[in-house]
From Swiss-Prot:
The keyword Transcription applies. One of its GO terms (biological process) is positive regulation of nuclear-transcribed mRNA poly(A) tail shortening. Component of the RNA polymerase II (Pol II) complex consisting of 12 subunits. RPB4 and RPB7 form a subcomplex that protrudes from the 10-subunit Pol II core complex. DNA-dependent RNA polymerase catalyzes the transcription of DNA into RNA using the four ribonucleoside triphosphates as substrates. Component of RNA polymerase II which synthesizes mRNA precursors and many functional non-coding RNAs. Pol II is the central component of the basal RNA polymerase II transcription machinery. It is composed of mobile elements that move relative to each other. RPB7 is part of a subcomplex with RPB4 that binds to a pocket formed by RPB1, RPB2 and RPB6 at the base of the clamp element. Transmembrane segments: none annotated. This is DNA-directed RNA polymerase II subunit rpb7. It is found in: Nucleus.
Length: 172
């Protein structure tokens, strides 16, 4: 799910940047340090939409760097248990398949794939095929899945997904 949140960060800047272009340089540094990162609390920071406040700087006695407190608004992507997402299949194995929904990596185990779909080891491309042959899941296919659980690391979020419910599975 996507959110538009107000966040804050302490930005450490070299004193040589404290000049007439301070706000521009601080904004550029904030973009490069924050966009595309993942925090366990908020999720993936997709993009910064605005910089609302840049505090007066405080000089760190130990290093000489200047610390600014920056308040900004950002678009955040945080997956939740039970959420339904569209994803692209990236890898298929006999244990299940991996898919990606934006920056989120999702694993769908064979236990969470409909029982009528079996792994086809004889195929040129590894895939899951339904017994009647009407449906096939292989690399680069688009699937609709439901998140069953998430695991948060320091810099990534992983999810377990399922296509065993109604209206889930291959799209198209």
């Amino acid at each position: 799910m996507f959110f538009h949140l107000t966040l804050e960060k302490d930005l450490h800047m070299h004193p040589k940047h404290c000049g007439p272009n301070l706000f521009t340089i601080a904004t550029q540094q904030l973009y490069s340090e924050v966009e595309g990162t993942c925090t366990g609390r908020y999720g993936f920071i997709i993009t910064i939409t605005s910089v609302d406040f840049l505090s007066k700087g405080k000089v760190l006695e130990s290093s000489g760097y200047v610390v600014f407190n920056v308040k900004y608004k950002a678009i955040i992507f945080k997956p939740f248990k039970g959420e339904v997402l569209d994803a692209i299949v990236t890898k298929v194995t006999n244990l299940g398949f991996f898919a990606e929904a934006g920056p989120l990596s999702i694993f769908v185990s064979t236990q969470l794939i409909p029982s009528d779909m079996i792994f086809d080891a004889q195929s040129a491309v590894p895939c899951f095929v339904s017994e009647d042959g009407s449906s096939k899941i292989s690399k680069d296919d688009e699937v609709r899945l439901q998140i069953k659980g998430t695991r948060v690391d320091a810099t990534e979020i992983f999810a377990i997904g399922s296509i065993r419910e109604d209206y889930l599975g291959v799209i198209g």
